Swiss-Prot record:
It catalyses: GTP + H2O = GDP + phosphate + H(+). This is Elongation factor Tu. The keyword Glycosyltransferase does not apply. Residues 60-64 are annotated as: G2. One of its GO terms (cellular component) is cytoplasm. Residues 136-139 are annotated as: G4. It comes from the Bacteria. Disulfide bonds: none annotated. GTP hydrolase that promotes the GTP-dependent binding of aminoacyl-tRNA to the A-site of ribosomes during protein biosynthesis. Monomer. SUPFAM superfamilies: EF-Tu/eEF-1alpha/eIF2-gamma C-terminal domain, P-loop containing nucleoside triphosphate hydrolases, Translation proteins. It is found in: Cytoplasm. One of its GO terms (molecular function) is translation elongation factor activity. It comes from Rickettsia felis (strain ATCC VR-1525 / URRWXCal2).
Amino acid sequence: MAKAKFERTKPHVNIGTIGHVDHGKTSLTAAITIVLAKTGGAKATAYDQIDAAPEEKERGITISTAHVEYETKNRHYAHVDCPGHADYVKNMITGAAQMDGAILVVSAADGPMPQTREHILLAKQVGVPAMVVFLNKVDMVDDPDLLELVEMEVRELLSKYGFPGDEIPIIKGSALQALEGKPEGEKAINELMDAVDSYIPQPVRATDKLFLMPIEDVFSISGRGTVVTGRVESGIIKLGEEIEIVGLKDTQKTTCTGVEMFRKLLDEGQAGDNVGILLRGTKREEVERGQVLAKPGSIKPHDKFEAEVYVLSKEEGGRHTPFTNDYRPQFYFRTTDVTGTIKLPADKQMVMPGDNATFTVELIKPIAMQEGLKFSIREGGRTVGAGVVTKINN
């Protein structure tokens, strides 16, 4: 049979399975592909193909992630599944696999477990907008009261971490029954995909967001002025539009008088484009790498924030020793390093390599930032951690 071509006409959503070890995340991922393959919406992918996830590097950190794709009537999905707990922590903090939504897998036989909690908390911290629950292994539970109890526990846990626990769809089923082709197993998978389709919101496309471009380089072109280059992160920039230069120094206003790509002049640059932007009346020395160009008023510079951070283990090339309060590494945001001081919470004496932790950072210079911004922590040019801004402190 010829391989069906995925139609890119449907809206695209990135999703992932999260939850405690052995609750059935990978079995569920396999079951989704096998059930959807029957209607031509996926290539059936077996458990062991997904479980042998390839290693990828994201900002100097090795993460094992399996990617599968499938489609429903309404959407095209890219789905990530990680083999180990540490891979999830790294994946969510680095944003290696951006998640527009998640499927939280909970074993009906065990109920919520420590990693269930940790994944819900991480999802909240890194800004996963919505999730749907799959209560797995219901074929192993004979008592309907027990099922109801587990569902209540899951809803309470979601509410505790700031998700709407009462509203979130909880689908009960068995990934194993679906893999075995049993009708009740398949029915639950179809119900789950309907819930994901309707409950996980459609993400805003990068071009529909406000304009932002991290500055990578600055040139002076005689007779024309100053050109900054970089990749447009979000939004669209048009000729004649007023923009702000934000970060490192006081915010300045300027006007875009030219957009150039591959030596051709354009009317506009949009998300994903590598462009040069000509700035009216801006001097070469007033702009530098590490600042951003942005729509006026859309982003502010900050130097104090709270972060969720994964610290590399020694085996991953990280530090060999823990760090303590007032540790001063470099924080790499977008295109530049800024020195900062780490302030640990009162109850935390130190952070060990291989741990994830929450702490406050004070930078020596402000950076254009918003919650959800990713960064690396570096020491002597090597990456020792990866983090995400969870809260800005003014």
